[in-house]
């Protein structure tokens, strides 16, 4: 059965993207907005205001947006909607650390429209942006601010950042998001777990041998060396994307499908995590290959100890998962780009087919990228004569 996207109409809005010329905006935010526009979800009276330090005007920024869409949404740029979409793009040059440009931004954000401010910038600027939005009366009590990772470097810095933001915005105005949760197959994981009696009775350590969560990237740091060398794979990927996936896999059924109920169950998983031993962690850096730079060369830091690859074994001490290991791994410059979750079930307690039948396990494999989908590996008899020979075949559940 093919997945169907249902369009939920939204009201007119002004979306202000701080860091509007950055990598995240060009690769993810702007292409996503254009996809929603083509799908009919973004109204014609909604506007996207790119904000950055670059010396651009609205026309040159629109050209930048078109270039980004050609690179990251090549199949859609030929559509007739592109010309209409581009007219809804504006640009304001500002300096987050001075008063330059803020009055111009205040004049462009409509007071009668829904307002969202996307902080696609370094977390060190979050507090200053919140202060400026308040100082120039740009944001209102109904405005939202959207924050991507990383949210602080550690617990104390995250708490300090929360305190600064809450000086100007209430908790229900602050959206700390993880874009991995927007993937169709990630959302489908909730439906598979809690919408089917088939899986939930088996979703525990009695039947599941182990679970693997893999996010492999074929690219290197790609111009993000200064940021990445401060963060590393652990902070860049494990503590946000992979931990979110771990929580969705391991959490108990929430009382209802609501943000607060789901969050509460995720928190229980995190509290049940065992401390991770150094013997259960593997860290590494990619080396050079031909004309391609090594990690140390890419970040221009020969003495860097920052990991570009990390794998760890995680244990959850509760009744459902005690004894079942979770393996999390992510890295750059790996053989192929692949993000998937593999739920590997235990072997049958006894094989009636004898030792020649081999070892077989069922596995539920959820692919997040590049090709979203879900398969269930089943053991069946190999067709044809020659006795009972067993093979594993994937059942496509997409």
Regions found by a protein language model. Give the residues of each.
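Secretory/organelle targeting and membrane-embedding segments
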Residues: 1-146, 151-398
């Amino acid at each position: 059965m093919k997945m169907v996207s249902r369009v939920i109409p939204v009201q007119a809005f002004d979306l202000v993207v701080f860091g509007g010329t950055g990598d995240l905006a060009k690769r993810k935010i702007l292409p996503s907005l254009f996809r929603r526009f083509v799908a009919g979800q973004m109204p014609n009276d909604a506007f996207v205001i790119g904000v950055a330090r670059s010396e651009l005007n609205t026309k040159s920024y629109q050209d930048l947006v078109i270039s980004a869409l050609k690179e990251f949404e090549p199949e859609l740029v030929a559509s007739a909607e592109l010309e209409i979409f581009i007219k809804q793009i504006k640009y304001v040059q500002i300096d987050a650390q001075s008063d330059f440009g803020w009055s111009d931004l205040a004049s462009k954000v409509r007071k009668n429209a829904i307002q969202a401010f996307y902080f696609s910038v370094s977390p060190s600027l979050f507090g200053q942006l919140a202060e400026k939005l308040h100082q120039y009366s740009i944001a209102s009590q109904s405005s939202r601010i959207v924050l991507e990772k990383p949210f602080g470097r550690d617990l104390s810095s995250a708490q300090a950042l929360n305190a600064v933001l809450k000086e100007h915005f209430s908790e229900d105005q602050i959206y700390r998001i993880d874009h991995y949760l927007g993937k169709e197959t990630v959302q489908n994981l909730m439906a598979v777990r809690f919408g089917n009696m088939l899986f939930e009775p088996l979703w525990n350590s009695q039947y599941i041998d182990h679970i693997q969560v893999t996010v492999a990237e074929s690219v290197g740091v790609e111009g993000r060396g200064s940021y990445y060398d401060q963060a590393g794979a652990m902070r860049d990927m494990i503590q946000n994307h992979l931990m979110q996936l771990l929580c969705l896999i391991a959490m108990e059924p929430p009382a209802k499908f609501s943000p607060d109920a789901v969050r509460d169950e995720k928190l229980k998983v995190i509290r049940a995590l065992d401390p991770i031993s150094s013997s259960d962690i593997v860290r590494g850096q990619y080396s050079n290959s031909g004309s391609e730079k090594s990690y140390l060369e890419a970040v221009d830091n020969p003495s860097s100890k920052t990991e570009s690859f990390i794998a760890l074994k995680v244990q959850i001490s509760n009744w459902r998962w005690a004894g079942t290991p979770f393996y999390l791994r992510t890295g750059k410059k790996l053989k192929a780009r692949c993000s998937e979750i593999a739920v590997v079930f235990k072997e049958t307690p006894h094989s009636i087919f004898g030792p020649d039948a081999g070892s077989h396990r069922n596995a539920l494999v959820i692919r997040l990228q590049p090709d979203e989908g879900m398969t269930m590996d089943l053991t069946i008899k190999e067709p044809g004569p020659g006795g009972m020979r067993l093979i594993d075949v994937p059942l496509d559940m997409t």
